[in-house]
Regions:
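Glycine-rich N-terminal segment of FAD-binding domains in flavoprotein oxidoreductases
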Residues: 28-58
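ATP/nucleoside-binding phosphotransfer catalytic cores, i.e., glycine-rich phosphate-binding loops
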Residues: 188-191, 195-250
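A glycine-rich beta-strand to alpha-helix segment
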Residues: 36-42, 46, 121-147
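A glycine- and small-aliphatic-rich helix-loop capping segment at beta-alpha/alpha-beta transitions
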Residues: 52-62, 145-154, 220
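N-terminal glycine-/serine-/threonine-rich phosphate-binding loop
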Residues: 1-39
């Protein structure tokens, strides 16, 4: 669709392994040209199959990868299991010898200072590759439709989360009730994500089918922030058959 390549798999495990294989190929190609690869990761259960395969990899030189994560709740305790930094630490960052990992500080008192600090880290050199999902409301990172912008200058900012996004965190089993889910977060912006040379988007389950259809079949618009993937020069979307169920009949 437009410039976006799409692959559909019979199972989410097959989807995750295929995404890992392309990720490995991209990283090795990047490493042939540069010393350090700068990689952004999403913290979500949609990424579990991909991250499991990546954590079991024996071919990538992780000592040449600097890691970032794309969003973080504000106001949760620093040790909360739902914190995205903790999620990724457990899933991948502590399991491989990264050159460096840059965490968004979820307990930052001065939000603007934390945004300035993390933006400085992001802009030290070009961003190379991002692995991400799509939310039930079509968001990428925490760029929900009501606040998403394709043209903002900042690469990270504070955002308020819409209730569809917050309910998704309950649906994923991360929180017991909607009221437990934080209402604000820090998120990398769409221009930051789109600046990456390579984009790998991994979207399993039927709960995402409507968002996938909007992403691929609707207009490129902030009403469905993920639709911007169709404008990237090197983006690949990996779906399982449940996530693709509304587009396979088109």
């Amino acid at each position: 669709v437009d410039t976006l390549t799409i692959h559909v798999y019979n199972s989410r495990q097959d989807m995750g392994i295929a995404a890992y294989e392309l990720y490995k190929k991209h990283v090795r190609e990047l490493m042939a040209r540069q010393k350090i690869v700068r990689a952004i990761f999403a913290a979500a259960h949609s990424q579990d199959d991909f991250l499991k395969a990546l954590a079991e990899d024996t071919e990538i030189d992780f000592t040449r990868i600097t890691g970032f994560h794309m969003d973080e709740y504000m106001g949760l305790g620093k040790d909360a299991s739902q914190n995205f930094g903790n999620f990724l630490r457990k899933a991948i960052f502590s399991r491989k010898p990264f050159h460096e990992v840059n965490y968004i500080q979820s307990d930052a008192i001065d939000i603007s200072a934390e945004c300035k600090r993390y933006e400085g880290l992001l802009r030290q050199a070009p961003l190379d590759i991002v692995s991400m999902g799509i939310g039930e409301n079509g968001h990428i990172a925490f760029n929900d439709p009501h606040e998403a912008r394709f043209d903002e200058e900042a690469w990270i900012r504070q955002t308020s989360l819409d209730n569809i996004c917050r309910q998704q965190q309950v649906n994923d089993g991360e929180f017991g009730t909607l009221s437990d889910v934080p209402e604000t977060a820090l998120t990398l912006t769409i221009p930051a994500l789109m600046s990456c040379k390579k984009v790998i988007c991994i979207v399993p389950t039927g709960r995402k089918a409507q968002a996938v259809r909007q992403t691929l079949c609707g207009p490129v618009s902030v009403a469905c922030p993920a639709s911007v993937l169709r404008t990237h020069s090197d983006a690949t979307l990996f779906l399982d058959k449940e996530a693709a169920e509304l587009i396979l009949t088109i």
